[in-house]
């Protein structure tokens, strides 16, 4: 396979697609939930990630599985079918970065909220 030189600012660079995927609304929450709980079933993930629809959670998990960030294990011998999700080593390598973003958001929540209010009042 030809090695690609990443350039996040180039429209055709696959690294841009990866960054966009990581920034999607439910991706960070699903990865965070799997990091905290280690192994989860679909319904457990849906309960933890409040507000996610079944369709969006399914799409998010499929993307993460496709990209190798999540491992999906199906237990076909179980009735009803049992499916579990966990982070792959690649997914685990993303956790520290997402934890930093989470910490930054929590640390700056009040200031950003105040800025939003001031902005809206200035209109």
How should each PLM-predicted stretch be described?
Residues 13-56, 75-77, 82-84:
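N-terminal helix-turn-helix DNA-binding core of bacterial DNA-binding proteins
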Residues 77-98:
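Basic, amphipathic "hinge/linker" alpha-helix immediately C-terminal to the N-terminal HTH DNA-binding motif
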Residues 111-123:
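Short, charged recognition helix plus adjacent turn
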Residues 93-111:
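Short, solvent-exposed amphipathic helices
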